[in-house]
């Protein structure tokens, strides 16, 4: 089983589309205040992805990193895009009246830490790939739920989801190519540890949202 097959097996164990929170989202069974609470929490994860990519880009710019200047520049552009997406998330949070200044729950803080746990450019890339390769399906599920179940119209409040439903196919493909070129000399177990931390962190963030709503 190659690296990406192993990563997919880990993803199957932490498939957030099977989490009760997202299942209720799809079925229209979340209260609006639960959506608002989630929006405030997940904002920290959106920031963490941008921070992780920014750190990876900075590491890749080091001449000893094994990345060339074009690859480092590509990572820098990707990081800048994700930083801009924080504002898109805040459009969604604002429609819900979410408190984006609230301190994150412990589960959310742990998620952010796992998403930024990469110690070098390759580990940061693996973290980003793990997140973004799953995002199209997750973002599409969320978008469909918002429009079909919660009365949202596609527009500024849902742009984060529509963008990630499409754009992350490209981002994940770019990251995968950079990762594949470096696997022969990499510590695969460490990279899979990073990936599992990312996936578990996302799952547990949702656990925290359920606990906050008294569902656990």
What are these regions (language model features)?
Residues 1-216:
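Non-heme di-metal
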């Amino acid at each position: 089983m190659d690296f990406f097959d192993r990563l997919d097996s880990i993803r199957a164990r932490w498939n957030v589309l099977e989490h009760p929170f997202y299942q209720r989202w799809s079925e229209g069974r979340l209260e609006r205040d639960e959506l608002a609470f989630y929006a405030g929490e997940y904002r920290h994860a959106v920031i963490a992805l941008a921070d992780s990519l920014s750190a990876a880009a900075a590491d890749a710019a080091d001449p000893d990193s094994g990345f060339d200047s074009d690859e480092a520049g590509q990572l820098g552009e990707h990081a800048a895009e994700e930083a801009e997406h924080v504002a898109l998330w805040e459009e969604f949070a604002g429609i819900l009246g979410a408190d984006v200044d609230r301190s994150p729950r412990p589960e959310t803080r742990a998620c952010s830490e796992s998403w930024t746990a990469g110690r070098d450019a390759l580990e940061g890339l693996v973290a980003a790939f793990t997140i973004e390769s799953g995002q199209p399906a997750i973002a599409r599920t969320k978008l469909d739920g918002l429009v079909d179940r919660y009365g949202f119209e596609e527009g500024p409040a849902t742009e984060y989801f529509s963008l990630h439903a499409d754009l992350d196919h490209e981002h994940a493909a770019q990251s995968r190519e950079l990762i594949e070129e470096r696997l022969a000399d990499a510590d695969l177990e460490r990279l899979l540890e990073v990936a599992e931390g990312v996936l578990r962190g996302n799952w547990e963030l949702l656990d925290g949202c359920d606990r906050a709503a008294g569902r656990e």
